[in-house]
């Protein structure tokens, strides 16, 4: 499933007609029209689970991720861990660059023991990609999280920070190249790298 909003759904429909994929592409319009009424990343996940009546394990890949690594190792490890949730991670060269991301610390079993959202002074160079494997038995925790109005629907990092205190969340460190292309500077750098 690819979730978008009313503003961009027609663009995605045009794209989907010519996209080459071994998987069926299903577009989902979250029915929002602008940033003021958007559901947020966690809200969109909840929306798709409910709308499509999902009852299977879920792989969530944020649309602003661009990476060269394979998902196979991540998925195999997530299923092997039999963990409620696994999260894709990337090790930056410089710790100071982690200020732009969610910063993670792992224990010896690769469980997430610390999560800081965009800290001024990162305690690690290991950062969160917007990449999650959620076991079907724990999809309901998204609803539990969203019931508390203080929790942020637009920040997946806030969900993980909350979730790691509820259940085990494992991290998987990707190798290769990764970009968060959420702004033009990094989008242009990614274009130079991948094109």
Q: Where are the predicted features?
A:
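A short acidic, often aromatic-flanked loop/helix-cap motif at beta-alpha or helix-coil junctions
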Residues: 32-37, 95, 121, 178-180
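Structural beta-sheet core signal
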Residues: 2, 60, 87-88, 171
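Short, high-confidence coil segments that cap the C-terminus of an alpha-helix
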Residues: 55, 82-85, 167
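Conserved N-terminal catalytic core of the sugar/cofactor nucleotidyltransferase
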Residues: 1-60, 66, 73, 183
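Short acidic-glycine loop/turn motifs at beta-strand connectors
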Residues: 105-111
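Cofactor-binding loop segments of dinucleotide-utilizing enzymes, especially the Rossmann-like FAD-
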Residues: 5, 63, 90-91, 174
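Catalytic-core segments of class I nucleotidyltransferases/pyrophosphorylases
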Residues: 66, 75-79, 111-195
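Conserved donor-nucleotide/metal-binding helix-loop-beta segment in metal-dependent transferases, i.e.
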Residues: 69-98
